[in-house]
């Protein structure tokens, strides 16, 4: 069902002067949940696609799994660089939707698509030299060669992946995120079947092994991108925006706004990805058991993290709508409703993980003596990670709320402070200069994330409080 837009500027003064009623908060929570659930399931679908790929690659042997890990490191490092550019479509389009400006909704998508293509073409070509890069970084030449084969197929998923995110952002911005979920759910079994056929060679096709897995992902990524484009052109809720109208018209001012929003998002994502990569390197110094336990515990965190990611995008949309129509009280309410939802979900998941910490590692491990040792350490890390999980959920939702207000530069500075000025030094000191060992690394990550999350929530509180005061004064 398509929601009607609220008239811009309605009841602003009344809303600013009076406290939010319980019915307004209840409505906001319902609206946020309605937006968030398909977005969260779409994020989980991406994890499912990666998991099925790794399961199929695992049948090729340990060397292939190691190569896939290296290839994913190269690809995701690059993917994160451009992620902010296409993610900026969501707040720009949401604000235009709230302001009842359909031409600006279309223009927001247009600049996002162009940014994805312009950044994606050279970065895709760079992926084709993944083997040389990994060898230069000191990785095993044989494993690097296999990783290069995988990247030769996988690299072509970069551009369609970004374009799909931009199109998905438009869908969410106009309150219709469901088509992106249906596309993702359809893509998962198709990717599984195509990857199996191309890896092992069936139906008369050659056996391509690890290259086939990467190629399947790229083919499915392009299919998802095309499907999203078709949906945006043909489905009634999107037709009025004529999303590909004036596709080749360059809007320098809007591109500047997208870069101002998107580059700091990319920067913060790179800083976050980097600190977790650095933590993995530190864990590797404690041996393979510690590194394996770290990876399993992080995989659990990554799965839980997808739901706050969906809530975060919903926060961007809801706050963006309120900003677009000039309604500071609703913007504040939307952000804190989303932050509350993120906290409740992650607190519940943290409790569940704590209660099942001994069973979770068995889903990833066998019954050997080494596996038992890894499982024991993983269970201990999951207990240490209790504050880590909650803070991680809070920071991503608060970030989403701030993006709805076009606030991304100061959060980038907070990321520098939280991850690298505080978090990583704590990881190093507690891990290697105390008796905590691997637990010290995780405590350091938790400290950095708690600081980062607290700063983001505080900033959203301050900005929205000041905006409401300004509305009253006006």
Curated annotation (Swiss-Prot):
Q: Which GO terms describe its molecular function?
A: antiporter activity; xenobiotic transmembrane transporter activity
> What UniProt keywords are attached to this protein's entry?
Antiport, Cell inner membrane, Cell membrane, Ion transport, Membrane, Transmembrane, Transmembrane helix, Transport
TM ranges are 33-50, 65-87, 108-130, 150-172, 179-201, 211-233, 258-280, 295-317, 334-356, 376-398, 410-432, 436-458
- What would be one Gene Ontology cellular-component term for the protein? plasma membrane
Q: What is its main location?
A: membrane
- Localization: Cell inner membrane
Q: How does it sit in the membrane?
A: Multi-pass membrane protein
Q: Which residues form a coiled coil?
A: none
What is an annotated GO biological process for this record, any one?
Answer: monoatomic ion transport
Return the NCBIfam families for the record: matE
Physiological role: Multidrug efflux pump.
Q: Which family does it belong to?
A: Belongs to the multi antimicrobial extrusion (MATE) (TC 2.A.66.1) family.
Q: What is this protein called?
A: Probable multidrug resistance protein NorM
Q: What gene is it encoded by? A: norM
């Amino acid at each position: 069902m398509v929601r009607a837009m609220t008239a811009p500027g309605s009841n602003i003064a009344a809303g600013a002067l009076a406290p939010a009623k319980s019915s307004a908060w209840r409505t906001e929570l319902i609206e946020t949940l309605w937006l968030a659930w398909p977005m969260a399931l779409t994020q989980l679908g991406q994890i499912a696609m990666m998991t099925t790929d790794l399961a199929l690659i695992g049948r090729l042997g340990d060397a292939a799994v190691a190569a896939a890990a290296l290839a994913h490191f190269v690809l995701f490092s690059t993917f994160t660089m451009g992620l902010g550019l296409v993610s900026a479509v969501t707040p720009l389009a949401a604000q235009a939707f709230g302001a009842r400006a359909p031409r600006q909704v279309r223009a927001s998508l247009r600049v996002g698509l162009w940014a994805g293509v312009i950044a994606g073409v050279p970065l895709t070509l760079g992926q084709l030299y993944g083997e040389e890069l990994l060898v230069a970084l000191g990785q095993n030449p044989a494993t690097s060669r296999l990783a290069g084969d995988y990247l030769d197929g996988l690299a072509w998923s970069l551009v369609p992946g970004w374009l799909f995110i931009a199109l998905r952002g438009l869908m969410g911005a106009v309150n219709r995120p469901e088509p992106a979920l249906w596309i993702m759910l359809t893509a998962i079994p198709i990717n599984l079947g195509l990857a199996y056929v191309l890896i092992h060679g069936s139906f008369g096709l050659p056996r391509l092994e690890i290259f086939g897995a990467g190629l399947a992902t790229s083919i499915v990524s392009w299919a998802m991108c095309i499907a999203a484009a078709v949906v945006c052109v043909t489905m009634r809720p999107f037709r009025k925006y004529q999303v590909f109208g004036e596709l080749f018209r360059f809007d320098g001012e809007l591109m500047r706004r997208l870069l101002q929003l998107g580059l700091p998002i990319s920067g913060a994502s790179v800083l976050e990805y980097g600190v977790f990569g650095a933590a993995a390197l530190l864990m590797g110094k404690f041996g393979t058991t510690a590194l394996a336990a770290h990876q399993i515990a992080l995989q659990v965190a990554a799965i839980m993290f997808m739901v706050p990611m969906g809530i975060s995008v919903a926060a961007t949309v809801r706050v963006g709508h309120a900003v677009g129509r000039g309604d500071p009280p609703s913007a504040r309410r939307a952000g804190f409703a989303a932050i509350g939802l993120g906290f409740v979900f992650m607190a519940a998941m943290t409790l569940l993980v704590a209660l099942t910490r001994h069973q979770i590692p068995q889903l990833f491990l066998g019954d050997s003596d080494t596996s038992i040792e890894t499982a024991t350490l993983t269970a201990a890390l999951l207990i240490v990670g209790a504050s880590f999980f909650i803070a991680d959920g809070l920071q991503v939702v608060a970030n989403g709320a701030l993006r709805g207000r076009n606030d991304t530069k100061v959060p980038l500075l907070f990321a520098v402070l939280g991850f690298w000025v505080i978090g990583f030094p704590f990881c190093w000191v507690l891990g290697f200069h105390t008796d905590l060992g691997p637990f010290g690394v995780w405590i350091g990550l938790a400290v950095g994330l708690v600081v980062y999350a607290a700063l983001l929530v505080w900033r959203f509180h301050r900005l929205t409080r000041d905006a409401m005061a300004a509305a009253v004064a006006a």
